[in-house]
UniProtKB/Swiss-Prot annotation:
Belongs to the orthobunyavirus NS-S protein family. The keyword Ligase does not apply. GO terms for biological process: negative regulation by virus of viral protein levels in host cell; symbiont-mediated suppression of host gene expression; symbiont-mediated suppression of host mRNA transcription via inhibition of RNA polymerase II activity; symbiont-mediated suppression of host type I interferon-mediated signaling pathway; viral gene expression. InterPro entries: Bunya_NSs. Inhibits host transcriptional machinery, by producing modifications to the phosphorylation state of the C-terminal domain (CTD) of RNA polymerase II. Inhibits phosphorylation at serine 2 in the heptapeptide repeat (YSPTSPS) of the CTD of RNA polymerase II, suggesting that the elongation step of transcription and/or 3'-end processing is prevented. Inhibition of host transcription machinery leads to shut off of host cell protein synthesis and inhibition of the host innate immune response. NSs also seems to be involved in the nuclear relocalization of host PABP1. This is Non-structural protein NS-S. The lineage of its organism: Viruses, Riboviria, Orthornavirae, Negarnaviricota, Polyploviricotina. Keywords: Eukaryotic host gene expression shutoff by virus, Eukaryotic host transcription shutoff by virus, Host gene expression shutoff by virus, Host-virus interaction, Inhibition of host RNA polymerase II by virus. It comes from the Viruses. The keyword Cell cycle does not apply.
Length: 101
C-alpha cells in the first residue's frame, strides 16, 4: 500500500533508458536517464521514501544500485550509480521488479 503523502511515481524502462515521471506540488516532473548499464538490466525497486522534501528512489540490478533523488520544491533530480561489493547482489534485497515495456 502506498502512503497518500508520497508523491505518485511512474518508472518506465526501455532498453538502456529509464523514464521517470513524478507528480510534485509544482506539477509533473519527467526525466529520462540513459546508461549502457541499464541495457538488458532487470531493475528492482528496492526502496521509495520521502525525507525533508526529497523523494529518494533506490533501484537495483545485479551488483549495481541506481539512486534517484527528486527535490520536490524545485523539481530537480539527481541520478547516482553505485557498485556493490563483489559478495553482494540486489537480487537478495526485498523489492519489486519493474516490468519491461
Amino acid at each position: 500500500m502506498m502512503s497518500l503523502l508520497t508523491p505518485a511515481v511512474l518508472l518506465t524502462q526501455r532498453s538502456h533508458t529509464l523514464t521517470l515521471s513524478v507528480s510534485t506540488p509544482l506539477g509533473l516532473v519527467m526525466t529520462t536517464y540513459e546508461s549502457s548499464t541499464l541495457k538488458d538490466a532487470r531493475l528492482k525497486l528496492v526502496s521509495q521514501k520521502e525525507v525533508n522534501g526529497k523523494l529518494h528512489l533506490t533501484l537495483g540490478a545485479g551488483r549495481l544500485l541506481y539512486i534517484i533523488r527528486i527535490f520536490l520544491a524545485t523539481g530537480t533530480t539527481q541520478f547516482l550509480t553505485m557498485v556493490l561489493p563483489s559478495t553482494a547482489s540486489v537480487d537478495s534485497l526485498p523489492g519489486t521488479y519493474l516490468r519491461r515495456c
